[in-house]
Structure formats: C-alpha cells, structure tokens
C-alpha cells in the first residue's frame, strides 16, 4: 500500500502504556514521503474525536474522519499496523499542522 505524508490512515496503536493514546484509530502520517517510500515505519499523529483546546491539537475534517490530530502524541509505527487509507487532508490543514510541528519541535 502506498502511503504519503498528510494522509489519514487507520492504525492499530495497541499495546500501549500509561497515558499513550490507544486502540485502533485514525492517524495522520507526519513522516516525509522520502522516508515513507523506503522505510517500513511511519511517523504518525493519532486523531481523537474529542479534545480540549490544547495548542498541540489541530482540528481535522477529512472525508471520512473528523477530529483532532494530537501532535503531543506523535510516534513511529510499523506499516503492518495500518489497515486502511482515508486520503489526504486539505492544504489549509497541512499549513496548520506544519505551523504546530515547527512551533513544537523547532522554535
């Protein structure tokens, strides 16, 4: 299955420990396509259907998925955890994700 940056995919996140987001849920692929093309792992941000107004949570309104991308719970997963691809988010959402990623990890 070809998987690209900023696509929403269904991922089995179990097993987890403590406060990590768990269960099978939609996630946003964060890793760049250069990595996605060659590696068996992907960097993802889980998507939750309910969220408080945290600066690291970005609202996503995909075709089949609505919720908040949880940037503070980014993790790396094996491709075998992915069961479905829901498609890419909007350009406006991509810009917001990039802004929050930069603020979180660069600035």
Regions found by a protein language model. Name each.
Residues 1-107:
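Conserved functional hotspots at enzyme active or ligand-binding sites that engage polyanionic ligands
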